[in-house]
């Protein structure tokens, strides 16, 4: 009687990886490395910082990457991957078209503009829309509801607005609010710690949208002046890097909002620019400037995206949320 060949059992949790005992697993989970995906994009130095020996850290990361088949891909494979990215509708066809179909997963999308330009409105709308079925522009599949995390740094979140937007879409407002995890970040360290914790929450709760509104306010307030610029940019860079990891590893959309400041040296054209310096110029995959227009209309302009042309679109902020203008 012949023997039946069996496939080698592949690790499905951090505790099953080679070199990971109970105490090491506890350290990894406490530090936000509770999944194989999170370990695969970690660096040995990051694991050493939480008390894991360098050789063990290298072994763990190597094993995690093998499990996820992290390797070189052909350009054609990359094309197919990008074509399969999911997108969340903004509620406005004009704006969706500008963004190439909506707010895409595996990407940080930055909306920046002056007060009242619609940044937080878009964040609220996306937090509702992500819960829609795929065929309606959301990321929910069957009984698996896509959820959102809303990190609020300026106190701009309004549950009343979520309720209003949900009702207009024919959704149960209480269910919609149950699927949005809200947290108020009180300072930059707290903000960074929240994002670290998301490496555990995102896969566990099927979070498909992470909102940070706004990403720069605490960093600017706590590190003013040129003498603190290097420290501020270093911390902000690490924060954005972690958000990018979350987007990539868990196929999640990330929206960050940002403020603008006036440039006194600009005499022609738009004298405003997003705050955050070069760190924020390069971290987001899509950067969109928002401007006020007449009445409830707003103008969105793509200023940087490798796959999108520089272009503008007009959308409206209505009682029901983000929509196309009526005229």
From Swiss-Prot:
CDD domains: archRadA. It holds the Pfam family Rad51. One of its GO terms (biological process) is DNA recombination. Keywords: ATP-binding, DNA damage, DNA recombination, DNA-binding, Nucleotide-binding. ATP binds at residues 113-120. The keyword Hydrolase does not apply. InterPro entries: AAA+_ATPase, DNA_recomb/repair_Rad51_C, DNA_recomb/repair_RadA, DNA_recomb/repair_RecA-like, DNA_repair_Rad51/TF_NusA_a-hlx, P-loop_NTPase, RecA_ATP-bd, RecA_monomer-monomer_interface. One of its GO terms (molecular function) is ATP-dependent DNA damage sensor activity. Gene3D superfamilies: 5' to 3' exonuclease, C-terminal subdomain, P-loop containing nucleotide triphosphate hydrolases. PROSITE patterns: RECA_2, RECA_3. HAMAP family: RadA_arch. NCBIfam families: PRK04301.1 (NF003301), recomb_radA (TIGR02236). Involved in DNA repair and in homologous recombination. Binds and assemble on single-stranded DNA to form a nucleoprotein filament. Hydrolyzes ATP in a ssDNA-dependent manner and promotes DNA strand exchange between homologous DNA molecules. Belongs to the eukaryotic RecA-like protein family. This is DNA repair and recombination protein RadA. It comes from Ignicoccus hospitalis (strain KIN4/I / DSM 18386 / JCM 14125). The gene is radA.
């Amino acid at each position: 009687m012949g023997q039946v060949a069996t496939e080698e059992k592949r690790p499905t949790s951090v505790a099953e990886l080679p070199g990971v005992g109970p105490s090491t697993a506890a350290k990894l989970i406490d530090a936000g490395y509770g999944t194989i995906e999170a370990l695969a994009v970690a660096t040995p130095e990051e694991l050493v910082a939480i008390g894991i020996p360098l050789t063990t850290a290298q072994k763990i990361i190597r094993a995690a990457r093998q499990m996820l088949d992290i390797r070189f891909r052909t350009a054609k494979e990359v094309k197919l991957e990008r074509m399969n990215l999911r997108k969340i509708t903004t509620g406005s066809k004009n704006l969706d078209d500008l963004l190439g179909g909506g707010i895409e997963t595996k990407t940080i999308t930055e909306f920046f503009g002056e007060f009242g330009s619609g940044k937080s409105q878009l964040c609220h709308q996306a937090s509702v829309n992500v819960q829609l079925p795929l065929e309606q522009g959301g990321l929910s599949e069957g009984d698996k509801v896509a959820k959102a995390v809303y990190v609020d740094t300026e106190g701009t979140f309004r549950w009343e607005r979520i309720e209003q937007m949900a009702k207009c879409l024919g959704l149960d407002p209480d269910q919609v609010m149950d699927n949005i995890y809200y947290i108020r970040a009180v300072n930059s360290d707290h903000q960074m710690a929240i994002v670290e914790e998301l490496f555990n929450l995102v896969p566990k709760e099927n979070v498909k949208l992470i909102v940070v509104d706004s990403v720069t306010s605490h960093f600017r307030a706590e590190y003013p002046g040129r003498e603190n610029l290097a420290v501020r940019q270093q911390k902000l860079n690490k924060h954005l890097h972690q958000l990018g990891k979350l987007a990539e590893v868990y196929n999640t959309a990330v929206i960050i909002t940002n403020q603008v400041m006036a440039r006194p040296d600009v005499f022609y054209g738009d004298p405003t620019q997003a705050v955050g310096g070069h760190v924020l110029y390069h971290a987001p995959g899509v950067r969109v400037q928002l401007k006020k227009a007449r009445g409830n209309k707003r103008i969105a302009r793509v200023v940087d995206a490798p796959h999108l042309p520089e272009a503008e679109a007009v959308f409206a902020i209505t009682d029901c949320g983000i929509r196309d203008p009526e005229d």
